[in-house]
Amino acid sequence: MLDTINGLPAHPLFIHIVVVLLPLSAIGMIALVVIPPFRGTVQKYFVASGVVISAIGAFIAKESGAALEQTRGVTDEHHAWGNRTFYLAIALTVVSALWLWLDTQPKSKTKLATGIIVVLVSLAAITSTVLAGDSGAKAVWETRASESDVVPTVDSQESGAQ
């Protein structure tokens, strides 16, 4: 179902939802928790929407990655970071929803503790996204780059320099 789009592997297309939106949404949640003047209704809806779409995107990326794995294989490292990113996107959705609800209530220690958890999960989600992307890019491009024996250089005599 999620293996190809128009004959191309779907995974490289879907991961961009996660690579762009998950870190932005995580930063948005950190801003909501840490900067009270940023807590306007519009900001909350935008950030919350981004968090939910990120989690959905992480699921789609995970499933399309599993389909790609069947045909092309994948490194264990990329598989592990991809799974962590998916679970952290789900965790961020849950703790963000809880914190957003608690933000409508009077100040409490629960809200403070949940805010700290939101910040920590956000930082973990950003880190996991970067490491999943890095390991995926290495899996795709390291072998292709090493297969190329030709390294373009400019010879000073050929360029006319004396």
State where each predicted segment sits:
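Polytopic transmembrane helical bundles with strong interfacial aromatic enrichment
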Residues: 1-162
